[in-house]
Amino acid sequence: MIKLLRSYCLYFAWLVSCIGTLMSVYYSYLLNVEPCVLCYYQRICLFPLVVILGISAYLDDLSVKIYALPLALIGFCIAIYQVCLQEIPGMTLDICGKVSCSTKLFLLGFITMPMASALAFFAIANLLIFATKSE
């Protein structure tokens, strides 16, 4: 059973990246929530993963780990930094533009956007680590 699940890890990672991308676009363009600078950096890491993981899942190509894992880990680090900006009093970032990077916007009423982003990048990274070829 575990072997079967591990063979679908690339598909699950692709699904997580698709959901993250759709949520990002939904909040930006349909709800008109302006993203901060760190959100743009996280998008730079997330958006290519949709294409990269989609193609690699279709081709069952595990060499994608070389390209996708660094993107997921960099995105995770940026998201965790933004969570720290929001949660630790006194932390500031000078490059924030009109929208402050420490502004809290809750998804579904209980989780902040950067925390959801960090969880998504963490899930993608772990799914890539545990992925095996389909049989």
From Swiss-Prot:
Gene3D superfamilies: DsbB-like
Transmembrane annotation, as ranges: 7-26, 41-60, 67-84, 109-131
Main location class: membrane
GO molecular function, one term: protein-disulfide reductase activity
Membrane topology: Multi-pass membrane protein
Compartments, as annotated in UniProt: Cell inner membrane
Gene Ontology CC terms, in alphabetical order: plasma membrane
GO biological process, one term: protein folding
Keyword hit for Protein biosynthesis: no
Key words, A-Z: Cell inner membrane, Cell membrane, Chaperone, Disulfide bond, Electron transport, Membrane, Oxidoreductase, Redox-active center, Transmembrane, Transmembrane helix, Transport
InterPro entries named among the record's database cross-references: DiS_bond_form_DsbB/BdbC, Disulphide_bond_form_BdbC, DsbB-like_sf
Entry-linked Pfam families: DsbB (PF02600)
Disulfide feature: 36-39, 96-101
Family note: Belongs to the DsbB family. BdbC subfamily.
Role summary: Required for disulfide bond formation in some proteins.
Protein name in the entry: Probable disulfide formation protein
Organism: Chlamydia muridarum (strain MoPn / Nigg)
